[in-house]
Structures are given as C-alpha cells and as structure tokens.
C-alpha cells in the first residue's frame, strides 16, 4: 500500500514539475513573441465554437454543419460553367448585408452583373468592388482587406482569372509553367494566419479543367495548383443536374443543382444536397425549407399532396412552394423551428406548427 502511495506522490510531483516548466516556457514565449502567443485552447476563441455566415439555404447550412460558411476560414466553390457558383457567393453577400455586415467582391473576371446581384438581394451601393488588372494585385487587395479587420466576407471571382504579372508582360506563346500555382501558394501562406484573427471569411470561386492523358479516374481538376485545396477549410462542388421548367417544357425558369461538400474541416464531409436556383432570383429559400420540413416531418407528403396536419398546402411540389412564397409568416416560422431542430437539438415531436389562417391553439 505504501509503495502505491509513493508512486502516486511521485507522479503528482512529476506533473507539478512539468506544469512549472511549461509556465516558465510560456513566460519566455510571451516575452519574445507577445502576450497570448501560447494559451490553453479552452481560453482561446478557437475553443468557443465556430461563427458562421448563413448561405441563404437551410439545407446548405445543415450540410456545411455549423450553420453556414465558417468565419476566419478559406472556402473554395468550384464546378462546371453555369452551375451556380457565383450565385452561391452573391447569396452569401446578401445574408452578410442583411445582418449589418460588410462584404467585398474582387472581380478578376470583370464580369459581375450588378442587376443580377441586386435581384439576389445584394445592396450594390454598400458592396465594395475591386476589378484588379493582375493576380498579384487582386491577392494583395484581399490581404489589405483582411488585415483591416472590417470586412466580414470577401469573394474572389475567380482563381482562373488571377493572371500573374509575368504572364501579362510576356508574349502570347511564352511557356510559363507553375506561375499561378506559386502565386496562390505564397498568397495563401500569408493570409491564413490573419484570417482567423480578423474573423473574415474569404471565398474563392474556381473553374474546372481536364487533365490530358488520364485514362482511369476523374480527369477533372481545378486551376491554380494544389495550395488552395490544402488551405481551404471548406470545398464545395456545384453541378447542374436538371432544368426547372415553368408552365411548359420549353419555359426554363431555373436549374436544380447538386452541392457536394468535398472537404470540411469544421464538420463531417461528403454531404450532398440539392438546391433550386431560379434565373434572376437566386436560391429558392422556400424550396429548401419545404425539403427540410419534409425531412424533419414538419410537413407531410402523402402522394402528390403536401400538408401540415390536416391542412393542405397544395398538390404537387410547385404548388406547395408557391403557397410558402405567399405565406411568408408560415415560411419564417418553419425556418426558425428547423434551425432549432438542426442546430439546437430540439425534438420535432415537441413542435406544433400550421398555416397562419388555420392554425389551432394547443389546449
């Protein structure tokens, strides 16, 4: 018994000695590098959860896992042409502005449509815009904005359009291998550390290219080298899966797109969701709420009919979406309840909800 006690005492003394040694090291580190250079994770902002920016779709917020795009992180959104990449970023800018935040758009492609941005809810009078001439200029502007600490969201459109100065100065036929990859690698090394301190979210839109000579596996790859893949905390792949038609088959009013979380450092990856994007309107909030409400049994689907309890919303998906567009009070109530279920762990069984004009008080 005494031997066991001696072992415990020795272990405690060893623990105390190691803690004293770490404390002395911490004092020296703070003396050399400044206060807060070494702290316990529980005392730092890192250990207090991840702040996020809503994507504008409750389905995408759930797929990402933290209620939206994580702040202080690098995000890459990539996919084929006309798949909805820019729409996702403009919708995020709209959400930032709704909550009183500040957003910036670095338009390296020189192709931002202010009319479309305004239609998606972006306040173009308050949106900071830069149309740089070179890739170096674009990334330095992004760095300045991050260091300012005043910007909540920066969108870079796109990585493929970040042309290095040497490429612009050279001849059209010059072979300059790896210039853009080296540019991206250096820029990302510089901004990663300051991003977490400023809580700025930076989103890079990227394009797909085909690898030459690939016989097996996926021949697609993104531009700008591998650095962005490594530094990104979140990578979203966006692909168009079908067209959304109106009153006739020839009346195309939008696209249905699939968003896959290819990489996620803040929640489990590889989740897939489908979004409806209407031309000139953006992501259909009501369609996302309808799908999420069916998933969590706030809305019932029997055959082609959609209902809440005994009260019918409409026959067919489009009719139910139109009903939710008209009944904004109900739609807002559904979204609030869904966020409590998804992000706060509230049981769907504890919720009673119904259309405003027919809702019955629970006895």
From Swiss-Prot:
SMART domains, A to Z: AAA (SM00382)
Purpose of the protein: Can catalyze the hydrolysis of ATP in the presence of single-stranded DNA, the ATP-dependent uptake of single-stranded DNA by duplex DNA, and the ATP-dependent hybridization of homologous single-stranded DNAs. It interacts with LexA causing its activation and leading to its autocatalytic cleavage.
Tagged with keyword Transcription regulation: no
InterPro entries reported for this sequence: AAA+_ATPase, DNA_recomb/repair_RecA, DNA_recomb/repair_RecA_CS, P-loop_NTPase, RecA-like_C, RecA-like_N, RecA_ATP-bd, RecA_C_sf
Presence of the UniProt keyword Cell cycle in the record: no
Annotated localization: Cytoplasm
Superkingdom of origin: Bacteria
Species of provenance: Borrelia turicatae (strain 91E135)
Binding-site positions, ATP: 79-86
Gene this chain is encoded by: recA
UniProt-recorded name of the protein: Protein RecA
GO molecular function terms attached to this record: ATP binding; ATP hydrolysis activity; ATP-dependent DNA damage sensor activity; damaged DNA binding; single-stranded DNA binding
Keywords: ATP-binding, Cytoplasm, DNA damage, DNA recombination, DNA repair, DNA-binding, Nucleotide-binding, SOS response
Family statement: Belongs to the RecA family.
Primary residence: cytoplasm
GO biological process per UniProt: DNA recombination; DNA repair; SOS response
Gene Ontology CC annotation, any one: cytosol
